[in-house]
Amino acid sequence: MTKYALVGDVGGTNARLALCDIASGEISQAKTYSGLDYPSLEAVVRVYLDEHSVSVEDGCIAIACPITGDWVAMTNHTWAFSIAEMKKNLGFSHLEIINDFTAVSMAIPMLKKEHLIQFGGGEPVDGKPIAVYGAGTGLGVAHLVHVDKRWISLPGEGGHVDFAPNSEEEAMILEILRAEIGHVSAERVLSGPGLVNLYRAIVKSDNRLPENLRPKDITERALADNCIDCRRALSLFCVIMGRFGGDLALTMGTYGGVYIAGGIVPRFLEFFKASGFRGGFEDKGRFKDYVHGIPVYLIVHDNPGLLGSGAHLRQTLGHIL
C-alpha cells in the first residue's frame, strides 16, 4: 500500500499543497489555495486533507521566509505559527518547515535532463558544491553539498548582499538607487521590483521622468522592442544575473553547477539566451578561467518546491536520494 506524506510550497500569495509518495518521491494531486482566503496555514492543510480524504503522518512545507527556530512569521503574509504546535494539532509524526530555496536546492538531485536548460560551461562534477538562485518577488539563494550519501542544503539570505557594480553604467545605477533607498542589495536589482528599479534608474540617469510601469510592462515592451529604456533594463538585468551567479560560483567553487529557479527568467527565455548573461557570469578578471567550465542551468520543472520538499522529507525519514 502506498504511503503518502504532505508537501507544500507557500509564498506570499498562494499555498500549493500536494501528496508525495514516500517510497518513490512522486508528487501528485497538487492544488493551489489563495492564502488570503484562510486564517492560517494549518487551516489550509486541514482543508486539503479533507478534500482528498487522505490520512498522512508526515509533512514538509517550504515557506518563502527565513526559518530560524520553532516560531515562523511569514515575511509577506500575516500567517505566523509554532511548528511544534502545528505538528501536534495535525497529529503528525514529523513536520518539517523549510525555507523555499532549501526546497528548490533539494529538488536538484531529483531533476531529469528535460527539466533543465543549460547556458554554457561543461559537465557538472559529481560531489562538488551546487548553487541555486532565483529572481521573483525577491532574490532567493541556497547552496547544496553531498556528504556521506546525504544532500545538505545550506540556506541563507544571499539575495541581500551588496549590489556590486562592475561597469560605469552599473555604478551610476547604484548611485541613483542609493540616493533613493539607502542600502542597495542584489535583490534591489534582481527581482520583479528590481527590474522596475533598473528601468527607473536608467531613465533618471538621462534626466527624464520614468513612467509608472510594472515588471510585466517592462518585459513586454522590451520583447516588443518598442521601448529602448525597457530593453536596456532587461538586458542589464540579464547581465547582472550572470555576475551574481558567477559570484556564487566563486564563493563555493560550485563545479557541481549553478541553477536558476524562480518565475521571472522563463518569461523571456529567448531574450535571456541571446543576452549577456553568460558573459557576465564569466567576467571575473583573473578568475575567468576558473568559472569558464562551470555549467549554468535554468530549472523548467513545474513544481521544484514541492519536489524538493518531498526529497527533504524522504531523506529525513532515512531514504537515500
Curated annotation (Swiss-Prot):
What is the enzyme's main class? transferase
Species the sequence originates in: Salmonella heidelberg (strain SL476)
Superkingdom of the organism of origin: Bacteria
One BP annotation, GO: glycolytic process
Signal sequence bounds: none
Q: From the UniProt record, list the reaction(s) this protein catalyses.
A: D-glucose + ATP = D-glucose 6-phosphate + ADP + H(+)
The name under which this protein is listed is Glucokinase
What gene does this protein come from? glk
Pfam families according to UniProt:
Glucokinase
Q: What is its EC number?
A: 2.7.1.2
Q: Provide the protein's localization.
A: Cytoplasm
Which residues does the annotation say bind ATP?
8-13
Q: What is stated as this protein's family in its record?
A: Belongs to the bacterial glucokinase family.
Q: Which UniProt keywords apply?
A: ATP-binding, Cytoplasm, Glycolysis, Kinase, Nucleotide-binding, Transferase
Q: Which residues form a coiled coil?
A: none
What GO cellular-component annotations does this UniProt entry give? cytosol
Q: What is its main location?
A: cytoplasm
Keyword Kinase listed? The answer is yes
Query: Under the GO molecular function aspect, what terms does this record hold?
Result: ATP binding; D-glucose binding; glucokinase activity
